[in-house]
């Protein structure tokens, strides 16, 4: 086992969406988090989901839970297609507030999904399915 692997900080990923009053919408984020959890074994130790508003867990709750499970570094991913006020201002402010209680924890906020060839594949897949 490499030294880097032995001493790597325990990392958590929090996937954040807007949140909805519709259970089905919130359940989709749970499923995404489960899929990511299965795909990133060995790279990310803890995977959580959170909502900006309208549903639980909140960003603060997911941050606190990650720390309680031993996270030393937290990566927050805004699960949004495009950059905007939520991903550029609201989520960073909410994460900063949550992190205040845990000054020993480092955190990073990723870019939203954005433009990526795999997004195009998903769009085309949806078009083909709609055409049937």
Label every PLM stretch briefly.
Residues 1-132:
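Active-site-proximal alpha-helix that buttresses catalytic centers in soluble enzyme cores
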